[in-house]
Amino acid sequence: MVFKGDWRFYWNNDEKQETVLHPGDIISLPTNMFRGFENVGEVQGMCFSILGHDDAGGGVVWAPRVIEEAKGHGLILLEDGKLVDTTIGETIPEGKKPMPPLTPEQMATFDQYTPEQMATQVGRAGTYTPSTYKGFPNQTPDTLTYYDIIGPTDSEGHNFQVKPSDKNGDQFNVYGIESSGAGHTGKYSREAVEVMLVHRGEFDISCEHEGETLNTTLKDGDIISFPKGAARSISPLGEGFAYLVVGGDYPDAPKT
């Protein structure tokens, strides 16, 4: 999810397929696929990353090229994932071994995607179709619009526009909330964790949970994680856009 800068994402074993994303764009990267990314813009960049299934996938699997190039810089990756920097005098601890590069047979087990296949994994800011789902909290529909962005294709009431990256489900949904002026969701709660990532604009936030109340204003790049069951409201102060990440493949509807 690109917040700032222009980012090149590339994939497959040969790293030759690519696409460039700009601020507000989002990409859903499939599991079991080599990928990389780099800031190709002229300003300092920043991306948000969402990992599915409440874990990091058991660690990172590095392409052979990465391990070999690291050696050229004096860096040795160990089998346990730790990094040894020989340029500052570090040595491989006793009993530890360098991570061997993957064999051609192992490399052949990774999935390969064409640009056309990956196009279904990319969402472009400004191109989303408004959601027709009636369960979103919205007291100002004239100024507040929701979008179904990432989620299962068979989700009831939603028409997600970006394909999930995991064939077994990501265990999260991503929605967009856009304001053309001041607005208000009204107070609501969810039985799942909900994270709000502000792309642009200012949003007044109120959150009540276990006897405590938080009132704050989020601006460009700010994040808030709403606990399960917390009562919250979101009030844009003007034009803006934010992503809402909700846990679960099929989360329950918000309660108002």
Regions from the PLM with identified roles:
Residues 34-121, 231-256:
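Double-stranded beta-helix
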Residues 4, 32-34, 42, 182, ...:
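A generic structural motif
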Residues 158, 173-191, 228-229:
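Conserved short histidine dyad/triad with adjacent acidic residue
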Residues 38-39, 179, 184-185, 197-198, ...:
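Long compositionally biased, domain-poor regions of proteins
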Residues 77-178:
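A short, N-terminal "cap"/entry segment at the start of jelly-roll beta-barrel domains
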Residues 1-23, 30-33, 189-220:
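A short beta-strand-loop-beta hairpin characteristic of the jelly-roll/cupin
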Residues 24, 30-32, 179-184, 220-221, ...:
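Tight coil/turn sites that cap or link beta-strands
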